[in-house]
């Protein structure tokens, strides 16, 4: 949110644009936790179906975030940088709800791999 307005994600998608999401400092937010940022965005964009929005936000925080920073990362793929977080297991009964459950219930990684190293 900036000036009490949110980015119009429907318009962004309609125009074929990509967006990324991250944290930028405590001067403009109350937390540097990316999961808090994702949760805030999940609540701020009420005009988009929650599961669809959750998937969009995870892509914005991973693949599209890496692309915005010109990093060869952001997805699990041969040749990409192996930056991976391992999180507590979730009891997700419906696999289509995995993205929303991750955003709602994740606090921090249990293990992180940067460049393939713990």
Where would I find each of the regions flagged by the language model?
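C-terminal cap of metal-dependent C-N hydrolases
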Residues: 82-118
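His/Asp/Glu-enriched, well-ordered alpha-helical/loop segment
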Residues: 7-89
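Helical hairpin unit composed of two closely spaced alpha helices linked by a short loop
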Residues: 2-3
């Amino acid at each position: 949110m900036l000036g009490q307005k949110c980015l119009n994600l429907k318009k962004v998608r309609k125009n074929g644009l990509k967006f990324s999401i991250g944290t930028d400092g405590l001067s403009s937010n109350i937390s540097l936790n990316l999961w808090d940022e994702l949760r805030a965005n999940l609540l701020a964009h009420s005009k988009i179906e929650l599961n669809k929005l959750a998937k969009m936000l995870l892509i914005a925080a991973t693949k599209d975030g890496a692309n915005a920073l010109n990093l060869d990362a952001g997805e699990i793929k041969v040749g990409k940088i192996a930056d991976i977080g391992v999180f507590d297991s979730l009891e997700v009964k419906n696999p289509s709800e995995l993205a929303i459950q991750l955003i709602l219930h994740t606090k921090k990684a249990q293990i992180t791999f940067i460049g393939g190293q713990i």
